[in-house]
């Protein structure tokens, strides 16, 4: 017999009754029934009930074991009495009578219990992550993650892609976040960087003549943490292809992701890839207040400025006299009660706005009546025009925000989400995907007037050099994101592979030719040697698994995540370097006040 086990703790069934077996695992739960000890023995695969009484030579030793001790038992498989069968367990028809016990590892008093559903502070869970990971939900999440990655790999290989690894230590590159710098011992005063993404390398792979690349790539970014983002590192399904259009990229990655969500989505509806809408970035902001809309929510915001221009509601009327302002309406079907309207108004105030105007419609017997402060100020003709434009009726409401769109769109998007959730409009058993396209390449700083890249600096401008010679703020890129249920899952672009267009694009953002060559020298030089048109994207594995696991926090699907302050409490990172380490690297630490 094997030194530790003949079966896993999920393998034994009624067919094994009478066999002598060996199991190893953790003591999940101990129950003393008056001289008979019952132990739920757990391993990665499942749970088996084992028992022991005073007739067994192992009884005295088994009395001493406690939760989370790691033990090995030898025993005989017995059938449970019919009234004691547990249909919820694969091993629920049997139990193992213990004849021999070996303690493989004792456990001290536990800082958190593995058994049960008790909640613990995240700090405790992360400090003792190896215990937290023993919990059933965490085991399921990590297994799901492994299965998702394996499925992605298989699907990419089936599409003719090959997996190539790119360097983990490279040069610093401005790609939208702060780099993690690594000092060089051999080159004092110089630094490597951990890659924010394999961006330049995967493009160089295309220039090298490889047609289809992918990898499960680690990425490192020094970012502020969020519930859906790690502050230090994450993994992505990274891919790139030569001789492709934007639609080719969509047609490649969409079936892969749809297949993964169908395979692991637990029966939730997955929109077919051909039904994933392509929404312009400007329209996404206008309709949903975000470039990662949750399309499970049917609410679409609309511009209602004309109904307030010159109206009796002075706040909006005067606002519209300013250039670049508008009034945006958020329809709220079934939200037509003063209580709900007041609650949403309070929500806007918590978000830092003065409030939200609202109108709700009710049946007054003789016909439809518009109610609320706005309705009183703008009159029945305007409120009726608004109602018809928004397609609302009795029992419905509409909320209004005004100003320059960038000043209120974020709050409007949040309000749309809250309205959809509270009114039961948002589907909960569906994965709704949408491509966001036509991203602006540039943005202008309102204070300085300077132009900088709004998104990926490596994307090909629509219209090429001719577009760059016109108004920079009108230039759109062959750049795209894929949103699902309010999260950005994929980001990508058709790349700018022509050196003269690359120089012009960076020039408009204030980068001189020398700086471009210094920062992106390898890529810039490679483009002088017959670079093919190419494009690709990257899908965030952590967020995908988070959605599939129905978790609200990305740390629930990462094996050893950092906390909100970018600290690893278990490994005590970041740590202070020793004086010898600093001396060897030619560094000294200067702490700023």
From Swiss-Prot:
Q: Name one GO biological process term.
A: aspartyl-tRNA aminoacylation
* Residues involved in L-aspartate binding: 175, 221, 455, 495
Presence of keyword Kinase: no
InterPro entries in the cross-refs: Aa-tRNA-synt_II, aa-tRNA-synth_II, aa-tRNA-synth_II/BPL/LPL, Asp-tRNA-ligase_1, Asp-tRNA-ligase_1_N, Asp/Asn-tRNA-synth_IIb, GAD-like_sf, GAD_dom
Q: Which GO terms describe its cellular component?
A: cytoplasm
In chain numbering, the residues marked as site (Important for tRNA non-discrimination) are 33
Question: Sorted alphabetically, which CDD domains does this protein's record hold?
Answer: EcAspRS_like_N (cd04317)
Q: Which residues bind ATP?
A: 221-223, 488, 540-543
| Any GO MF annotation of the entry | aspartate-tRNA ligase activity
Keyword Protein biosynthesis applies: yes
List the catalytic activities from the record.
tRNA(Asx) + L-aspartate + ATP = L-aspartyl-tRNA(Asx) + AMP + diphosphate
The similarity comment for this entry is: Belongs to the class-II aminoacyl-tRNA synthetase family. Type 1 subfamily.
Function text:
Aspartyl-tRNA synthetase with relaxed tRNA specificity since it is able to aspartylate not only its cognate tRNA(Asp) but also tRNA(Asn). Reaction proceeds in two steps: L-aspartate is first activated by ATP to form Asp-AMP and then transferred to the acceptor end of tRNA(Asp/Asn).
How would you summarize the oligomeric state and partners of this protein? Homodimer.
What is the protein's name according to its record?
Answer: Aspartate--tRNA(Asp/Asn) ligase
Q: Which gene encodes it?
A: aspS
